[in-house]
């Protein structure tokens, strides 16, 4: 049986315009397809990934235009619905960003910082991204 891995995603929006997704969320989806077992905790600026309906404008450099902007909320929904990967958001990181629970995609669970040690115990590996 594969080891269960807890993935805490904190560094947000790196390479998302170039890649059209978050590299870690993409990697977790691919690994889940190969049989790995993951749980995701979004913290810091990465809590914004779970905001429903968010988007990013396209990027133009000279005459080149990036027309496939990332849709991070769709990536989170893919993890939840298609990949069956549990996704948590640290509730203490919502308020400083002006976010509320009702702004998040359905299925994302709130977690307090105080609950982190208990979720650590449920996983063989903990990675901070």
Regions found by a protein language model. Give the residues of each.
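Histidine-anchored nucleotide/phosphate-binding helix
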Residues: 19-40
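Anion (oxyanion) recognition and catalysis
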Residues: 32, 81, 120-121
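N-terminal glycine-rich phosphate/adenylate-binding segment common to multiple enzyme folds
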Residues: 87-129
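A glycine-rich helix N-cap at a beta->alpha junction
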Residues: 58-91
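Short, glycine-rich nucleotide/cofactor-binding loops
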Residues: 6-22, 44, 48-50, 68
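Short, basic, glycine/proline-bearing loop/turn elements
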Residues: 9-14, 58-65, 99-102
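Short internal beta-strands
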Residues: 37-44, 87-91
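Short amphipathic alpha-helical segments and helix-helix/interface helices
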Residues: 25-29, 74-78, 116-117
């Amino acid at each position: 049986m594969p080891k269960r891995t807890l993935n805490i995603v904190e560094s947000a929006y790196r390479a998302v315009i170039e890649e059209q997704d978050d590299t870690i969320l993409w990697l977790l989806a691919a690994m889940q397809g190969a049989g790995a077992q993951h749980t995701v905790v979004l913290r810091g600026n990465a809590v914004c990934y779970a905001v429903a309906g968010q988007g990013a404008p396209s990027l133009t450099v000279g005459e080149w235009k990036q027309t496939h902007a990332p849709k991070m909320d769709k990536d989170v929904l893919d993890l939840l619905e298609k990949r069956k990967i549990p996704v948590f958001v640290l509730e203490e990181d919502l308020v400083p960003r002006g976010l509320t629970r009702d702004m998040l995609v359905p299925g994302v669970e709130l977690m307090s910082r105080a609950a982190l040690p208990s979720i650590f115990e449920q996983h063989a590996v903990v990675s901070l991204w």
